[in-house]
Amino acid sequence: MPLRLEASSADFAPAFAALLAGKRESAQDVNDVVSAILADVRLRGDDALIDYTARFDKMTVSAEGLRFSDDEVDTAVALIEPALRDALALAAKRITRFHERQMPTAISFTDEDGVRLGQRWTAVSAAGLYVPGGLAAYPSSVLMNALPAKVAGVERLVMVVPTPAGRINPLVLAAAKLAGVDEIYRVGGAQAVAALAYGTRTIAPVDKIVGPGNAYVAAAKRQVFGTVGIDMIAGPSEILVVADGANDPDWIALDLLSQAEHDAAAQSILITDDRAFADRVERAVTDRLRTLSRTEIASASWRDHGAIILVGDLLRDAPALVDKVAPEHLELAVADPDALAARVRHAGAIFLGRYTPEAIGDYIAGPNHVLPTSRTARFSSGLGVLDFMKRTTLVGCGAESLGAIGPSAVRLARAEGLEAHGLSVAARMNRGWE
């Protein structure tokens, strides 16, 4: 049974706070193991990758065999039925078009003192994409991570994916080819992150690493941050649905289960102002769990982390609760979703109206599905083009403009006790240190 809360009850505040404070991430401490793997790969390079691949993926491979050949990729693509290939192509097209609109513009102007000022954006040179392996790997995540990098102008995009016992979902390779991935390597885990960060004889290092992974991959990304950039440390998936009683309860039940089926640690929350509707949704979830293929996972998620919150008025009460949850996915299944969305500050992605299930955003809508979890939407955003770019500011002074602003720079340098700073300005104004 999910947690049931009523905003009007006397104990709501502490109960809601406990819901927010509930820890869903793995408590597994893997930092020492990961540190050893990173150090080993940094020291032994390809030999370490080969050893770990044999140990963890039960697969013997040579250094030359770490990289997928073009023929292997083409063979995998040929295995995919045309309708599925077309669906993947449509997703890639829509994702690309949306992210093209995220491209920033340069700034260039001359201010009132005659100083030229500006800002330009450039892409990182190389990015690495981690893809969880096996037959259950998600090609949609390949598109969502790779296409923004390509739109940004990343010159070299590298994908690493473990292949347990040599198995890989051919859709993953097809998505990589469609997205323009330049190199694909059959290596995973913390050792793959190490290879991307430090480089080996076979795998040249990258500048930024993105993509989801298990506790070992997450710990590895944390530890190599600073040597390379990373996107985020993703936690279990989550959805918050704000729905009125005019909805089909089965639709809302399926939306809640769309995240619950990801992981037993995922969280699905419903906020509604209709008690009878809440009851119908709960019954619909129970009915659907009887037939869902991933029922064991979804049932554990709904039982341990699910919640239904009853409020007096959705427009008045829901936004404050939403902002405290700061959900990864927010569905607004109400008559006027825009009015409600305008009052929400913290959410990774917002899905507007009764006909916009979160799952449409996972695959085909266009915006990225790599989103902040675990309340980090309070201060961070989903993956996008800017994650693969950096800005550089530009300053240009002539003799006259330096004369206009230089004296103040000299005074500030003197106040900070940095003599050479001030002299470097004063010398250009034919002045000494005063």
Curated annotation (Swiss-Prot):
What are the positions of the active site?
A: 328-329
The protein depicted here goes by the name Histidinol dehydrogenase
The record's GO molecular-function terms, alphabetically, read: histidinol dehydrogenase activity; NAD binding; zinc ion binding
Q: Name one GO cellular component term.
A: cytosol
Gene, per the UniProt record: hisD
Q: What does the UniProt function comment say about this protein?
A: Catalyzes the sequential NAD-dependent oxidations of L-histidinol to L-histidinaldehyde and then to L-histidine.
What does the entry's cofactor note say about binding and number?
Answer: Binds 1 zinc ion per subunit.
Q: Which residues bind NAD(+)?
A: 130, 191, 214
Highest taxon of source: Bacteria
Which keywords does the record carry?
Answer: Amino-acid biosynthesis, Histidine biosynthesis, Metal-binding, NAD, Oxidoreductase, Zinc
Q: Which family does it belong to?
A: Belongs to the histidinol dehydrogenase family.
Which prosthetic group or cofactor does it need? Zn(2+)
